[in-house]
Amino acid sequence: MASFSEEAMDSYMYPAYNPYSYRYMTPKNKGMSWRQKNYLASYGDTGDYYDNYQRAQLKAILSQVNPNLTPRLRKANTRDVGVQVNPRQDASVQCSLGPRTLLRRRPGALRKPQQSPPEQGSPASPTKTVRFPRTIAVYSPVAAGRLAPFQDKGENLSEKTEALRSEGSRGEGGRPEGKQEDGEIKEQTKMDKADQEEVAPDQTRPKFQFLEQKYGYYHCKDCNIRWESAYVWCVQGTNKVYFKQFCRTCQKSYNPYRVEDIMCQSCKQTRCMCPVKLRHVDPKRPHRQDLCGRCKGKRLSCDSTFSFKYII
């Protein structure tokens, strides 16, 4: 019996094939220098290679002893990456799905919603789970909480209306059913009208304002100086000046007494379409009649009206 077991173990421990009988295909390593000509220089890690080879040998031996025996599972060769983000600022993160933007936490997200007291005999209502906004687009007004100010207000208004309805129904418990329903309908119509009046001015008032450049005329009464400027930053679509200009002598801030769109005098276009264009002037000292749009594409151009920046 001993000789039979020794022969069997010899066949298990010494495989019939030679492990170095075939040729190894050496893959090309991109980061390897042409001067490195060692035998095992092409492999990324020789320890991993020999570990895999020994594991294959063990698997072959165990399959001969018992097909059900398999080597223990080992930890996968993966790497975990953690990202720490300031909750008060937006941060762009590269993940497996592509570039994503982690939005800052809204100030009203941590406030507890108004909960009505539980009724008698009913179990305690579970707490609401916190819902985080989805990442829709980087430049979408729905993506950030500060660009969508109406969502929180709508949720607060709906919670207030529900609380008022529950309190009104409990306070009017002794009334008849018909009168109680009429009172609820009247209160509901009043609350809906009040909510519409509160939300309407907020919706008309934008949270961010785009700026555009216009041409303005200034006049300082103290110094009796008049000057022009083609770089008056106004709110888009209006003549409201966002940044004031200072007088060159007394350094007082003044608003222009007249603001116009930057356009050519002859063709009345922001980009001149005249066959014979006027000469290009210095953008630092422009003149009204010489703004022709020939400096398009430059950092300081006469006909650039829109800005990619917005003021919150």
Swiss-Prot record:
Residues 86-95, 113-128 have a biased composition (Polar residues). One of its GO terms (cellular component) is cytoplasmic ribonucleoprotein granule. Residues 152-196 have a biased composition (Basic and acidic residues). A zinc finger (3CxxC-type) spans 214-297. GO terms for molecular function: mRNA binding; zinc ion binding. Ovary. Keywords: Cytoplasm, Developmental protein, Differentiation, Metal-binding, Oogenesis, RNA-binding, Zinc, Zinc-finger. Residues 79-133, 150-205 are annotated as: Disordered. The keyword ATP-binding does not apply. The keyword Zinc-finger applies. GO terms for biological process: negative regulation of translation; oogenesis; translation. InterPro entries: Zar1, ZAR1/RTP1-5-like_Znf-3CxxC. It is found in: Cytoplasm, Cytoplasmic ribonucleoprotein granule. mRNA-binding protein required for maternal mRNA storage, translation and degradation during oocyte maturation. Probably promotes formation of some phase-separated membraneless compartment that stores maternal mRNAs in oocytes: acts by undergoing liquid-liquid phase separation upon binding to maternal mRNAs. Binds to the 3'-UTR of maternal mRNAs in immature oocytes, inhibiting their translation. Disordered regions undergo liquid-liquid phase separation (LLPS) for the formation of membraneless compartments that store maternal mRNAs in oocytes. The 3CxxC-type mediates binding to the 3'-UTR of mRNAs. Belongs to the ZAR1 family. This is Zygote arrest protein 1.L.
